[in-house]
């Protein structure tokens, strides 16, 4: 959608769909448990856990619930067998797609992911087939109406990598994964509340989708997100305002 932050729009759509399915808490709890198990329970020294906590709070999870999930991760238990698996492939229109999963059964997960790609005209790729098009970055998105100079000054002083302003006034701040929490804290301390924020795989290039291929990509995303094992779906598909109006 030209002229404004594609990142926030894509993530908001996903959040709304996940919430509608009642899956988002299950997925966030899995991520909290795994992040705490792998990196410890201190959000100050565990960027992955910090990102998961931010996502939990943004989706109105109670502190009690998220603290219990962190405690489960630190203490081990049944969740200790969960592993992070990343699949990559080509979606409709040649779009590059990355699928982040948390699973205790690789065979089940890859079967579900492959089925989604096949049903929508894409194909599951090999390791490295599209991952070179993505970089893990912190993304902090602001809605139109805030001062570009204020956000830029606060973000760059706190260690952000880049600040992008869109035609409609929306602003995205990009950071390294390690600096994500510090930059977000600095922005919030300056009275700047983000519309969305997370550590994510950000594409370096975009693939334009027409009115025929765009619905197929959206169907692929829906099918992937229907899997309890799938945590995040990232892609480089570009849907123009004109095409979006036909969907």
UniProtKB/Swiss-Prot annotation:
Gene Ontology BP annotations: regulation of DNA-templated transcription
Keyword DNA-binding listed: yes
Keywords: Cytoplasm, DNA-binding, Transcription, Transcription regulation
InterPro entries per the UniProt record, alphabetical: Integrase-like_N (IPR017856), TACO1_YebC-like_2nd/3rd_dom (IPR048300), TACO1_YebC_N (IPR049083), Transcrip_reg_TACO1-like (IPR002876), Transcrip_reg_TACO1-like_dom3 (IPR026564), YebC-like (IPR029072)
Listed GO MF terms: DNA binding
Top-level taxon in the UniProt lineage: Bacteria
Location of the protein in the cell: Cytoplasm
Pfam families, A to Z: TACO1_YebC_N, Transcrip_reg
Cellular component GO terms, alphabetical: cytosol
Family: Belongs to the TACO1 family.
Record's protein name: Probable transcriptional regulatory protein SG1259
Upper classification of the organism: Bacteria, Pseudomonadati, Pseudomonadota, Gammaproteobacteria, Enterobacterales
């Amino acid at each position: 959608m030209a002229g404004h932050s594609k990142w926030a729009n894509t993530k908001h759509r996903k959040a709304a769909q996940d919430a509608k399915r009642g899956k988002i808490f299950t997925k966030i709890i899995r991520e909290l448990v795994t992040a705490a198990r792998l990196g410890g329970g201190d959000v100050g020294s565990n960027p992955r856990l910090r990102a998961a906590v931010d996502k939990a709070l943004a989706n109105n999870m109670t502190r009690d619930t998220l603290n219990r999930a962190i405690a489960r991760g630190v203490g081990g238990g049944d969740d200790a067998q969960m592993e992070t698996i990343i699949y990559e492939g080509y979606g409709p229109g040649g779009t590059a797609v990355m699928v982040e999963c948390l699973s205790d059964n690789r065979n089940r997960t890859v079967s579900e992911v492959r089925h989604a790609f096949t049903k929508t005209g894409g194909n599951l790729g090999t390791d490295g087939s599209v991952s070179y098009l993505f970089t893990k970055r912190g993304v902090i998105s602001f809605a139109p109406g805030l001062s570009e100079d204020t956000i830029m000054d606060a973000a760059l002083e706190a260690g952000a990598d880049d600040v992008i302003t869109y035609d409609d006034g929306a602003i995205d701040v990009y950071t390294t994964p390690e600096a994500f929490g510090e930059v977000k804290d600095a922005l919030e301390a300056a009275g700047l509340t983000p519309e969305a924020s997370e550590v994510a795989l950000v594409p370096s290039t975009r693939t334009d989708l027409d009115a025929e291929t765009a619905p197929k990509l959206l169907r692929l995303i829906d099918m992937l997100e229907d899997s309890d094992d799938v945590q995040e779906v990232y892609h480089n598909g570009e849907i123009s305002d004109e095409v979006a109006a036909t969907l």
